[in-house]
Amino acid sequence: MTEHKVNVEFGGRTITIATGKWAKQASGAVVVSCGDTVVLVTAVATKSAREGQDFFPLTVNYQEKAYAGGKIPGGFFKREGRPSDNETLTSRFIDRPIRPLFPESFLNDTQIMATVVSADQDNDPGILAMIGASAALEVSDIPFLGPIAGVKVGRVDGQFVCNPTVEQLEKSDLEIVVAASRDAVIMVEGGAAEASEKDVLEAIFFGHAAVQPIIEAQTDLRKLAGVPKREVAATSVDEALKTRVKDLAYAGIKEAVRIVAKQERHNRIGEITAQTLETLLPEYEGRESEIKGFLGDFEYELVREHIIKDGYRIDGRDTTTIRPISIEVSMLPRAHGSALFTRGETQALVASTLGTSIDEQRIDSLYGETRKRFLLHYNFPPFSVGETSFRLAPGRREIGHGMLAERALERVVPKHEDFPYTIRIVSDILESNGSSSMATVCGGALAMMDAGVPIKAPVAGIAMGLIKEGEGIAILSDILGDEDHLGDMDFKVAGTEAGVTAIQMDIKITGVTREIMEKALLQARDGRLHILGKMNQAIAAPRTDLSPYAPRITTIWVKTDKIRDVIGSGGKNIRGITEATGVSIDIEDSGRINIASTSKEACDKAIKMIRDLTAEAEEGKLYMGTVKKVMDFGAFVEIFPGTDGLVHISELDTERVKNVTDVLNEGDKVLVKCIGIDKQGKIKLSRKEALGAVLPE
């Protein structure tokens, strides 16, 4: 097979998409490269759907090979193991924009695999993998309603930048990933430093315009190397069976979807389903999934019709009303900060814990090791939706929701120089009926304020929905779980009163327009301000005092050439301080020393020990020292730990001294005065000049 390539200029760099050389037995395979970053992306679909398959089984796996960064994996086995959080999140980034673009009747097992085989620090392999997923599907025989492309948008010095470098991202006040087709935006995810809704919208559509050349390049590649698409049979509908199901269940479902309580509503729909199956299965044996499909279609139709035509939702709210909110803080006595945030039937128990630099997370990536001092972990136990399941590690959804909430809050976390703590937020979802990640954002801000973290401003989050039927459009504030399931969009926005800190959009239709997104952003702002008002009533500002169970961190500075004196040979000195006081000590290369302890007395003792280790003698100053060694010509007196000076025999007394031992012996405490320091740093001390003097307090 001949190799085909297309090149496209993108953000001042050249992206190359090639096919026909690697992985030729896959349904579709491309190699996407930019600079020294190279990603292989393959797409494979089974020849037919499994028997009884009633959903689309798409899986996306993104993996960064250690050799791509010139590294050997750590650990005993020395090979790549379970996916990192970054790999999991990137897999989700790739999945979300392509999932709605497969034909509804295509239910074959489909797998996208993106493998990073070379990586530099300037070209994001995740973005190349997203482009590659679309391109691999385009050149394959798999039916796909693409192409799409992705871009990361930053803003440096007020100017939007495509796929910013690491250096540019450090200066950027905005970082948003946009996936789009020719006509519409399909997925958005990112964060910003309290950006206005207008700026966020501009960034999104800057990204939409930027990806158009890549979309065209994929079309060109398909013309060069694509194969004919598979025929997908339209789903056949048994109209007679559909009519029977409608006659039996439609009226009951119409009443059921207006029941406000989630469990009661689901129970009633479950009863209607059971009754319908009991009536029809004797006649239509083996067609249970088909009957359930019709029931689901009727529920979908009735919920959407009620919203579009009547302007009212499942629980009776109009499109802009937020569910009732209740908030408690400080419920957990031993947690450093805690909050219980309840919005309707969604409830999050959120706790914040303060730690030291020892508690920072160390992350090993292709580009080396980094450290992370702000962590947020989101847990979604099965009981929160009245279910049971076997739980081990957090799933992709939990990792994704946690990262979204973390991104929303990290922009208001104080800098390390101002608040030298590691901060961990844990959100346990106790009940869920929509928008649990946004409840986590609200609860996380409240828990940090309760812990005394001086955050820049409170942050609230809200999930928006969309119902689009023909020309009829309804944008919903604070959506329920069923509205998420039956709607066309899940659009989450978090931020402060000043602006947006995080955004995420997923859609089930082929795209949303600028007008819809603008209206959703402005409606989300109104909802966010309402929620912030409720949060302000619970706790208006961060507490001025930390929890008595939180470590107190005191910062002192020493000269950089004194760091080795604090540490000591083999860590002897610092180990001695921690053992004697029970404190935790972190020393930075700059000479900054953070001392953490729940006891002020222990902290003060540790500071004194460090000051003693790093103190320097000053000429003319008095010191209380200890005689360490007696010689014929004088005595060596230690004035600080590890620092001593010589009291010459002539400086022992105003009278002539014949033997040093007549005045001083080893172990004696003696008040001395520093009378000089020579060029070699040797200290000259005098007992004679200190006679009659009193050591200052």
Curated annotation (Swiss-Prot):
Catalytic activity: RNA(n+1) + phosphate = RNA(n) + a ribonucleoside 5'-diphosphate
Compartments reported by the entry: Cytoplasm
Residue ranges constituting the S1 motif domain according to the UniProt record: 620-688
PROSITE patterns named in the record: KH_TYPE_1, S1
UniProt keyword terms in alphabetical order: Cytoplasm, Magnesium, Metal-binding, Nucleotidyltransferase, RNA-binding, Transferase
Tree of life domain: Bacteria
GO molecular function, one term: 3'-5'-RNA exonuclease activity
Primary subcellular site in the record, as a coarse category: cytoplasm
Any one GO cellular component localisation term in the record: cytosol
Chain ranges of the KH domain: 551-610
Listed Gene3D superfamilies: GHMP Kinase, N-terminal domain, K Homology domain, type 1, Nucleic acid-binding proteins
Annotated positions binding Mg(2+): 484, 490
Enzyme class per UniProt: transferase
EC number(s) given by UniProt: 2.7.7.8
Listed GO biological process terms: mRNA catabolic process; RNA catabolic process; RNA processing
Co-factor requirement: Mg(2+)
Similarity comment text for this entry: Belongs to the polyribonucleotide nucleotidyltransferase family.
Its job: Involved in mRNA degradation. Catalyzes the phosphorolysis of single-stranded polyribonucleotides processively in the 3'- to 5'-direction.
Protein name, per record: Polyribonucleotide nucleotidyltransferase
Organism of this sequence: Geobacter sulfurreducens (strain ATCC 51573 / DSM 12127 / PCA)
Gene designation: pnp
